[in-house]
């Protein structure tokens, strides 16, 4: 059976009252590499998401992690997908990115991990890259965009990729990308990250649920970003309408329990108590993970966000028992079987 072992080194434990604070695991952060940015600039796509991509380097990221008390960061490629109607160029950029991340993982053991990018919308190329990244490079999972030039998660054409990932018990980190197609008039007044990203994430996950992807491929685990996006609002409506849709043969039945049991949710986006409790209407505390969204906000802002989250968890009677789980233990369990070892 295909297995791999991950060892996440956590920072030294320190006592905070009666709580042992372990190194936090950050499941939502990005590294913007020079050759990736060059590929975007070549096609005038560096501003495709409506805002400039921030600078990144390993030293600055490690400094932030040390100051914030983060033991391990799981890196993913940001948006946009480097595909501009040239499959070979996309494959080369993504292969270079994955190999760079594998070297980072080797150079900084226990500090950096990565979920590989795949050269979608070319499904055959994505299957090849997934096998190489997971089997040879030691990727800790894969990152999938909500859509790649209009090819959405849950679409039937992605089934061969889902099969390969399922065979490897892969963790999939989802990240929103610009919707395709889209209206310029809709997104000119607000950045994509403000509204359209949560809508895009919700759209993609609903598409996967509607096709029972996580039931048909039961070894997959999916990390949904930004506090579940709009799913806490969308799922009750979807559940209420589904029986009528099934009765008229517009949709198939959905195994809600099985699907939702394979969804995990990161807290990137500075969650409030209201947001967290809304998220708990569709999941349980053992499926909630810390995410910073580094480096898209200044270090000081991200550290303040994390401090507020810690205080909020400590003060919340329902969530206080799960403080360490949310900050790092749930990430260990998520990658279990890829067993994250505590040191």
Predicted regions: what is each one?
Residues 2, 22-27, 31-72, 99-106, ...:
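Mid-to-C-terminal alpha-helical segments outside catalytic/metal-binding sites
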Residues 7-18:
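Bacterial N-terminal signal peptides
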Residues 25-29, 73-75, 113-116, 142-144, ...:
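Hydrophobic faces of well-ordered beta-strands that scaffold small-molecule active sites
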Residues 25-40, 172-181, 228-238:
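Short, solvent-exposed beta-strand-terminating loops
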Residues 51-56, 82-83, 119-126, 149-156, ...:
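Acidic-and-aromatic substrate-binding clefts and catalytic sites of carbohydrate-active enzymes
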Residues 77-205:
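Active-site gating/metal-coordination segments in enzymes
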Residues 182, 190-209, 221, 225-343:
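H/E-rich (His + Asp/Glu) clusters that bind or coordinate divalent metals
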